[in-house]
Amino acid sequence: MTHMINIQPRKPRFDLSDVPVFWNDGDPVLTRFFDALSIHFPDGERFFIQSVRNYQDLVTDPKLREDIKNFFRQEAQHGIVHDQYNAVMQSQGIHVEKVIARFKLFIRHSQKHLPAKYLLDMTAAFEHITAVLGEGAMEGEGEMFKNAHPAMRAMFMWHGVEEVEHKTVAFDVYETAAGGGYFTRASALIIGTLLVHAVVGSVLWHMLKIDKLQGQPLVLAKGFYRLYGPRGLITRLIPLSLIHI
């Protein structure tokens, strides 16, 4: 097994009542990028839990069994908190259910037609991606959310810490209970990375159009440069992303 970090479920509370629309340093792109992630988290977390639960009874190692239970607790709490923030986005004019309808359809079709082993492998890949984002959130004293609204900064930092804590649980279950396999692991990470960028990019652009910012190239260029420039918040995470392959 690869997991040695203690997984500690927490139940924090965040006051999201006064979160502004552009809560991350007043930057529309920086804000909506993380909004586009958040809006998918509740359904994504439930997908991850079910994918691991499919193999839970095949795990015999006591430490991993305990890690699985704490993984479930952490992921369930993530879903609850991001549902709360999604309600804030709804009140600010984002039609949450409409935005995530295709994502929900993708999950239903995947669970119906794909093998349980590949669903677990996809979960391990997505967990790697979210853990990399979590490590990025903590990098440089929290530079990713340095000037964010305090409650949003606390929410994403808490989520990031827990993603790092349980980052290898799905992978350990995949290796010990599902038989592992390099090819499917590598392909799942590649497909998962492309899927995350496609889905998040599409929703990000949809939100920016709702904000009527598609006609403000300087605002958009500044925000995307902060994410994907040579030292962008996402660009600098690429080396960490490749470790899983």
Show the residue positions of the predicted features:
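Conserved small/polar residues in nucleotide/adenosyl-binding loops
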Residues: 243-245
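Acidic/His metal-coordination segments adjacent to aromatic residues that form catalytic metal sites
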Residues: 18-40, 101-126, 143-148, 194-204
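Hydrophobic, aromatic-enriched interface-forming segments
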Residues: 129-132, 141-180
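Alpha-helical bundle segments that constitute or directly flank the non-heme di-iron/ferroxidase center
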Residues: 24-58, 74-77, 81, 117-143
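Primarily interfacial, aromatic-capped hydrophobic alpha-helices that serve as membrane anchors
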Residues: 192-218
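Carboxylate-rich helix-loop segments that flank metal/cofactor sites and access channels
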Residues: 8-21, 90-112, 126-134, 184-198
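Alpha-helical scaffold segments that form or flank carboxylate-/histidine-based iron centers
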Residues: 31-40, 62-77, 115-123, 148-162, ...
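Conserved alpha-helical segments that form or flank metal/cofactor-binding pockets of metalloenzymes
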Residues: 2-8, 72-99, 166-174
